[in-house]
């Protein structure tokens, strides 16, 4: 099994990066080949847009079967799931080696769906600035 873990550093003692699309490194661990480790720098870390999709494509190209990360957006989530890759959430502040150990012991939660609420994070003003401002931001004539 090939496992991908988002990481803030290039080794197993680094912390799991909570951001999938903007993580600094992907650490791939191949359990079948005596824990062979491959570290790949995330090219999408400084992308203006589309970082999540580009990161997902990197993981797919590396033939990962499982991803362990902190948080993941809807676009990379859909891309990974449609490729048959399972996604697990690591708790904040955990080291890569500990997340890997927790995965093997079935202590991590699989992310099977994302909550996509109304407005997709834009709030009540739907991105136009007409939120809970009691009329502020909108001219009244």
What is each of the regions a protein language model found here?
Residues 59-93:
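Mid-chain, well-packed structural core segment of small domains
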């Amino acid at each position: 099994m090939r496992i991908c873990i988002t990481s803030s550093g290039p080794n197993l003692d680094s912390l799991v990066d909570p951001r999938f699309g903007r993580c600094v490194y992907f650490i791939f661990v191949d359990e079948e080949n005596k824990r062979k480790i491959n570290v790949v720098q995330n090219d999408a870390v400084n992308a203006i847009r589309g970082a999540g999709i580009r990161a997902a494509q990197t993981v797919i190209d590396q033939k990962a079967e499982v991803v362990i990360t902190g948080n993941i957006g809807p676009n990379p989530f859909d891309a990974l799931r449609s490729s048959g890759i399972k996604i697990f959430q690591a708790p904040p502040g955990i080291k890569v080696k500990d997340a890997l150990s927790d995965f093997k012991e079935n202590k991590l939660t699989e992310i099977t769906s994302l909550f996509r609420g109304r407005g997709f994070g834009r709030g009540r003003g739907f991105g136009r600035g007409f939120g809970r401002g009691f009329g502020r931001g909108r001219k009244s004539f």
